Regions:
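Basic/polar low-complexity intrinsically disordered segments
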Residues: 1-203
Length: 203
């Protein structure tokens, strides 16, 4: 005997159906409904399904666009981080040339050596950039204004890029939630259509 619970399951609500396959199925489904709508028996179904289709794939496109922008912002931020790492490494010679390696001034810049900067990550890079800028500002008279201004510009650029990246990540997350909700709508619409068509052609 057939398990009647299968009738109440939404067979479109599965990760095994990709977005592309969902799109193709919905398009073919709409084409066939339209081709067989000579007596307008499928008009309401076509209208509802078209609305669900448009809403869903509009959301997908929006999510893709925002994700692409987020990825671009991430590249920008990573480039700034890499530029700072190179900057801190290159300026070590100038700091060492003006202060001995055991001096308090040198330790302000490189308390754990140059490798600390080379091994920096997103968890500590802003702290290191802030520290380097503060030290360059304190010793500007000896090391020159350019080191201080370059360190400040890198710190400012990083903060702007990081803020923009995090904001876009938040937008992408919110858009994913919207897309998921919209996919539920078209999944339900397609399953409802299956039941309606079945009820129209019993036997």
């Amino acid at each position: 005997m057939m398990d009647l619970r299968r009738l109440f399951k939404n067979h479109f609500d599965t990760k095994e159906i990709s977005d592309d396959n969902m799109k193709k199925f919905a398009e073919v489904h709409l084409e066939r409904l339209s081709a067989n709508n000579g007596t307008a028996q499928f008009t309401a179904m076509i209208t509802a399904t078209t609305a669900a289709y448009t809403s869903y794939f509009g959301a997908i496109a929006n999510e893709d666009t925002k994700f692409a922008i987020q990825q671009g912002l991430t590249v920008t931020m990573n480039n700034i981080v890499e530029n700072f790492k190179n900057f801190a490494s290159q300026k070590e010679g100038i700091v060492f040339g003006n202060f001995s390696k055991t001096s308090a001034e040198y330790q302000e810049f490189y308390p754990h050596g140059v490798s600390e900067y080379r091994q920096a990550n997103l968890a500590n890079i802003e702290t290191l950039m802030t520290r380097f800028f503060a030290a360059a500002e304190r010793h500007q008279a000896i090391l020159g204004a350019s080191m201080q201004s370059d360190a400040e510009n890198l710190l400012t650029d990083f903060r702007i890029a990081r803020k923009a990246q995090l904001e876009k990540i938040g937008e992408v997350s919110a858009q994913k939630s919207t897309t998921s909700t919209t996919r539920d709508v078209i999944e339900n619409e397609l399953m409802k259509n299956v039941h309606l068509i079945a009820s129209m052609f019993i036997g």
